[in-house]
Regions:
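Enzymes acting in ubiquitin/UBL processing and closely related pathways
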Residues: 1-257
Length: 257
């Protein structure tokens, strides 16, 4: 396995699986989406630390949605609890202003963002303006899902934290426009969802991604991000290790140890 991550639960992925999913037209599974969210969290932590700041957003994993949709008692599930608290989380989740969750339903991926500073849920659906059905119909389905997830996140906060009591009433669910140029095909919704999760800056995107070459570029960017996963206990081929972790960095690590 090229990448193995053990917190908050064990997941792994092989080089062949990465190749199959990240090639043109490849579709991601829950494992790839989970590893992507974990990697984005690591990158956010490093960025915040470099600026001497705290982490400002918290990424949840896609299985959160799966447990909610099955009507599991999420307040009793260790895996769900460890998405919010645990020794592997080295920042204060209760001080994050956003919670980010990749959501899959109707065989398509979207990104949901809970913005605590604005008391809004942003639903970033890359297929919203494809034109194959009305925006109203799509929004109605999303609102139902968002309401269920909203109540579940509120339950998790009440169950897993002491002293964090955000007002979760009367939040608005918003559907930003202009996220995608052109038509987003179903097979590409997952790469848009990861891009939107990474690049949403509160009211707009930091970087756009367009159909065609832009999609393939986003896939390759994600590959580089994933191969740089910290605390990876998998067996990454030496040629990639040498590219991602130059000898100079290895020597510095040895000296520090």
């Amino acid at each position: 396995m090229w990448i193995i991550s053990s917190n908050p639960k064990y997941v792994d992925i092989s080089g062949q699986q990465l190749c199959d999913m990240l090639r043109e037209g490849g579709e991601a599974d829950n494992v790839l989406m989970t590893l992507s969210m974990r990697r984005y969290q690591q990158m956010d932590i490093a960025f915040a630390a470099a600026k001497g700041e705290g982490c400002w957003r918290h990424f949840l994993e896609p299985d959160f949605m799966n447990h909610v949709s099955r009507e599991d008692d999420i307040s009793k599930l260790t895996y769900i609890k460890e998405m919010f608290v645990g020794h592997h989380i080295n920042y204060e989740v209760n001080k994050c202003t956003e919670i980010v969750l990749p959501v899959k339903f109707d065989l398509k991926w979207s990104t949901y963002i809970w913005d605590y500073s604005r008391t809004k849920i942003f639903v970033l659906d890359p297929t919203m303006h494809n034109g194959d059905e009305s925006d109203k119909e799509i929004q109605q389905r999303h609102r139902k899902v968002a309401d269920e997830l909203h109540g579940s996140i509120e339950l998790c906060i009440k169950s897993f934290f002491i002293g964090w009591e955000p007002d979760m009433r009367r939040w608005n669910t918003c559907f930003p426009k202009g996220l995608v140029t052109g038509i987003c095909e179903r097979k590409d919704t997952w790469i848009y969802a990861t891009h939107l999760a990474r690049n949403w800056m509160g009211t707009k995107l930091k970087r756009d991604v367009n159909p065609g070459d832009g999609i393939m570029h986003a896939r390759m960017n994600l590959l580089v991000d994933l191969l740089g996963t910290e605390d990876n206990i998998g067996h990454l081929p030496k040629r990639y290790k040498d590219c991602l972790f130059p000898k100079k960095d290895k020597q510095n690590i040895c000296c520090r140890n």
